[in-house]
Amino acid sequence: MRMAMSCGGRLVQRLDFSSSEEEDGLSNRINEAPQKGSPVSSWRTNNCPFPITPQRNERGLSPTQELSPSSDYSPDPSDKGVGGECPGTPLHYSTWKKLKLCDTPYTPKSLLYKTLPSPGSRVHCRGQRLLRFVAGTGAETEDPTLVNVNPFTPQSYRQTHFQPNGKRKERPEDDCSSDSQMKFTDKEHPAVFQSKRFVLRETNMESRYKTEFLEIEKIGAGEFGSVFKCVKRLDGCFYVIKRSKKPLAGSTDEQLALREVYAHAVLGHHPHVVRYYSAWAEDDHMIIQNEYCNGGSLQDLIMENNKKGQFVPEQELKEILLQVSMGLKYIHGSGLVHMDIKPSNIFICRKQTEVGEDESDGEDDVASASVLYKIGDLGHVTSILNPQVEEGDSRFLANEILQEDYRQLPKADIFALGLTIALAAGAAPLPCNEDGWHHIRKGNLPHIPQPLTPAFLALLKLLVHPDPATRPPATSLAKNSVLRRCVGKAAELQKQLNVEKFKTAMLERELQAAKLAQDECLDLPPVSGFSCRGRKRLVGAKNARSLSFTCGGY
């Protein structure tokens, strides 16, 4: 690439740039002989050892206008150096070598160099980011210590795990600047974290629900919102997605929606509690990802039986009562109360077990051991020690809760469980108020059309006793002999099996000891001409034997 620089309408010097010898070509052309009559020739005749540039920016020109071909600025002939010989001041060779000619096109090598980022610069990705983090409100950005405080977390757990231990893990200096926010001082440790004010307004990102899940069908709707059966695109498994009907941010229902998330997070995983996986907010709506129960709810089973004129058998009623009481035992043991036990909040999980035709014993395809009953919908959960009661369905509400007597909150779940089993047994729908409602609160069960054993019927009456102190706790129900009879036979068989296994092990040990003794006897040399076989004697070998014959008919 060749370029001519003109000064005052005359050709001063030809420049030739190459992509591989940019600097060498520049230094070689400086020493080339200029044309006659050019200013460069006069510089050489005046014994000026280096090319001299005019005084720069004397007229206040910007750096982009100095010596620009498009500029109308021309050196003033009256501007002279010392003695009028050299117009300007001489530059050192190294400075001249680094001089950047203004408005000169870049060479391919220089353009490539300018495209490379500097070591200290940050590269901004123009494409779509796979992980997009959206900052919250200004208040949350300024104070990174704002987090949600779970009200159901035990106080002892907070004191044990939220206190700083004095050990601080330092991060390398080359980490991202955002990581520095993870370091907190003694005044900012999680024990003093404050709760966020606008929890549901911080995720304005692309819909996670549409990105991660494929909606199959709508399986229910309630006070909270709609419930959908979905498949997660990543693992291909079924999940239940609950989405609130209306925006909850800033409303009175926000804390009610968060209560279910808090309760699920504290309870963790239990075989008789619907499993919780995740929760997030989209467009001010709360979304909860839970376990999918393929058997529906107990309410669905009751409605199906009513259409067919059937009832849940007593053995299955005992199994439902036993499993739900085990779930309540776990919830109450965690310091929480459900406060909304009813058939629509008890879900059924059926294990998919394949039974061959030859192995079928004529019983139902699904045995009691292959069905799990789980407690779900924790939207009304509250703490036993610090109750903030939100009344559930009035049909299952205990009288002491209506009177705001919260001294024995877990017994309210027992009362609702007794009425739930009565409905599963075939009782008519429960009244919401008036005389029928008060009749049940006096300890009377609704009419059950199917016959039940006296022991089981007495247990159900005990569950709805008007005195909450008389009702059995969940721990006692889980061990009740009336409920354990359905599994007592299996326990007895298991005990007998263990005894037989022990006997078999003892016999095998004796057999091995006998074989070992026989092998040792065979390995010993014979003593006094006798062998081990000579020691055996046949009793009665030389004695006379009596013979008797019996002939029929004689």
Curated annotation (Swiss-Prot):
Organism of derivation? Xenopus laevis (African clawed frog)
- Can the keyword Signal be found in this entry's annotation? no
- Please give the annotated consequence of changing K242M: Dominant-negative mutant; reduces the level of cdk1 tyrosine phosphorylation and shortened the length of the cell cycle
Per the similarity annotation, which family is this?
Answer: Belongs to the protein kinase superfamily. Ser/Thr protein kinase family. WEE1 subfamily.
Q: State the GO CC annotations.
A: cytoplasm; nucleus
Q: Please verify whether the record's keywords include Phosphoprotein.
A: yes
Kindly state the subunit structure of this protein. Interacts with cdca3.
EC number(s) given by UniProt: 2.7.10.2
Protein keywords: ATP-binding, Coiled coil, Kinase, Magnesium, Meiosis, Metal-binding, Nucleotide-binding, Nucleus, Phosphoprotein, Transferase, Tyrosine-protein kinase, Ubl conjugation
Q: Which Pfam families match?
A: Pkinase (PF00069)
Q: What is the lineage of its organism?
A: Eukaryota, Metazoa, Chordata, Craniata, Vertebrata
Q: Which GO terms describe its biological process?
A: meiotic cell cycle; mitotic cell cycle; regulation of meiosis I
Q: Give me the ranges of the annotated region Disordered.
A: 1-86, 145-182
Phosphoserine: residues bearing it? S38
Domain of life of the organism encoding this protein: Eukaryota
* Any GO MF annotation of the entry: ATP binding
Q: Where is the composition biased (Polar residues)?
A: 38-48, 147-163
Question: What's its catalytic activity?
Answer: L-tyrosyl-[protein] + ATP = O-phospho-L-tyrosyl-[protein] + ADP + H(+)
Question: What is the name listed in the Swiss-Prot or TrEMBL entry for this protein?
Answer: Wee1-like protein kinase 2-B
Its annotated compartments are: Nucleus
The disulfides recorded in the entry are none
Q: What is its main location?
A: nucleus
Cite the binding residues for Mg(2+).
N345, D377
Q: Which residues bind ATP?
A: I219, G220, A221, G222, E223, F224, G225, S226, V227, K242
